[in-house]
């Protein structure tokens, strides 16, 4: 059974996330995450519509320059489960993740299966990060993107 997790992808302030995560209704969802045996996700690149929306929202609060600088300095390639990762699949050293609604990606170590669904070669950099970070046990991928993935093996 799916559960709606009605929070923003990124909070404007880390403190907002900390306060919300203490709420009992949110705690129930977080406990479900921690006891799941399967994760289904799709990697997101940083230029997707939802991430442009977040950047626009940040611009409205005067944070967009800071966010863009943080993304550049940490060399984020995309998102896995709404958590920023770098090209090696690392997420811990990306400060902006303190504002992300996604789980600690070490959660992936505790599940039997992590199914990654990918469509579109624009997600390849993030897919490579997800593969390097060992977040993928099963990959569902469209044929053109699969071809590009295979072709890119030598450069990654």
What residue ranges belong to the model's regions?
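Conserved phosphate- and dinucleotide-binding cores of soluble alpha/beta proteins
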Residues: 1-156
């Amino acid at each position: 059974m799916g559960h709606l997790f009605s929070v923003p992808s990124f909070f404007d302030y880390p403190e907002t996330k900390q306060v919300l995560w203490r709420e009992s209704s949110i705690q129930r969802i977080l406990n479900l995450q921690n006891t799941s045996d399967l994760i289904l996700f799709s990697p997101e690149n940083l230029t997707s519509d939802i991430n442009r929306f977040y950047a626009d929202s940040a611009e409205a609060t005067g944070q967009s320059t800071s966010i863009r600088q943080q993304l550049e300095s940490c060399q984020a390639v995309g998102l896995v489960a709404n958590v920023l990762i770098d090209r090696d699949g690392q997420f811990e050293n990306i400060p902006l993740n303190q504002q992300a609604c996604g789980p600690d990606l070490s959660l992936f170590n505790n599940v039997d299966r992590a199914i990654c669904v990918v469509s579109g070669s624009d997600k390849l950099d993030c897919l490579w990060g997800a593969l390097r970070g060992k977040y993928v046990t099963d990959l569902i991928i469209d044929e053109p993107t699969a071809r590009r993935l295979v072709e890119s093996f030598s450069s990654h």
